[in-house]
Amino acid sequence: MEKKTVYNITNSIAISEEEAVNCNIPEVNKAEINLSQLKRNFDIIQGFLKPNTKFMAVLKGDAYGHGIRPIAKELINLKCDVFGVVRLIEAFTLRKAGIKTPIMLLAPISPSQAAWVIRYNIIPMVDSEEIVEALDQSASQNDTIVKLHVKINTGLNRYGVNPENAVKFIREIHEKYLHVQVDGVYTHFQDPDYNPDFTHKQIECFNNIIFQLQKQKLRPRIIHAANSTGIIRYPEAHYDMVRCGTLLFGLEHEQGQRNMPKGIKTLMELKGRIMKVRTIRAGEAGGYGSTFVAKKDSKVAIIAFGYGDGISRGWKEVLVAGKRVPVVNYFMDGLMVDISNIDETVKELDEAVIVGNQGDESITWLEACKSLGSYVDEQIQCITERVPKKYFYEK
């Protein structure tokens, strides 16, 4: 596959993005992020939606480790309607990047943060009168009206107003506060992949609240419930808007229970340079702690991708010269792999693939995370800042 690199983002501690674009920094490893695949994923997901259903791209956790600013800018080109984040700092990052798209906070704020929500034109989630009051007071001081979304707790039991109090809570906001407006109501599923019976109970509970709001002429403009799994498996829960995170980035669950739609793929591949090739004699140890002792004369390679870059101990295999090779030792700045069974000449600065394709072989995120007992969306966010991100379109 031919690639056209559009820009690089290198360690922000050492160098700015602008500098990274204009100079060729020697790199020993990288995360390659395929923006063409992002568009394909976006288009495939849109195919599940009815016309006029709004699309919220959930970009929490630095866009699931993919880089919140470049991903958001690409999604603007794709006509994404709303961005969802969890921390105020994520919303500030987008606004500071010049992004005007509506941004919604999917977790509660503290009263002291109300002024910042208004200053940066962010849509807050509320589930307590204390927050509504703080928003109303701050909005009054700024002579504006804040549009907010009320979260309903239908079973996840993290945030949200309990169902028996939801209609009363929303009605009182309408009656008591002049500078806030309930623009949306939403809920979040507890276990849509593995427990459809409970998910349907959540939908039924949520529908009952919507019905009561309609009867009292309190139905807000935007109703939403479906997350990534909900988009695929619960079309009755699409309502006015869907929230999409892991599916947009092609991140499967540990057992692949989601049944990913055809064509949805991950965007990110991880690659590292071979920094040293050497022979270890039979009986000698390689790396810290003598965890690897050669049973015979063995050729090993040191790859510049260690747990300081976000690779967990327990990573089983990588690709060298298009073949799978076992990882035999881990350290902060690299991996030691046994390349004794590779016939081809392997030399220093050759590229190894940690996750992705090389030749006819591939290692997927799902495969790697199963061996670690981890989740893909958990592991991919472990990749650290010192790994340069290279964004590209397929030619």
From Swiss-Prot:
It comes from Clostridium acetobutylicum (strain ATCC 824 / DSM 792 / JCM 1419 / IAM 19013 / LMG 5710 / NBRC 13948 / NRRL B-527 / VKM B-1787 / 2291 / W). Catalyzes the interconversion of L-alanine and D-alanine. May also act on other amino acids. It is an enzyme of class 5 (isomerase). Pathway: Amino-acid biosynthesis; D-alanine biosynthesis; D-alanine from L-alanine: step 1/1. Substrate binds at residues 158, 332. The modification N6-(pyridoxal phosphate)lysine is found at residue 60. The active site is at residues 60, 288. One of its GO terms (molecular function) is alanine racemase activity. NCBIfam families: alr (TIGR00492). HAMAP family: Ala_racemase. This is Alanine racemase 2. One of its GO terms (cellular component) is cytosol. PANTHER family: ALANINE RACEMASE (PTHR30511), ALANINE RACEMASE, CATABOLIC-RELATED (PTHR30511:SF0).
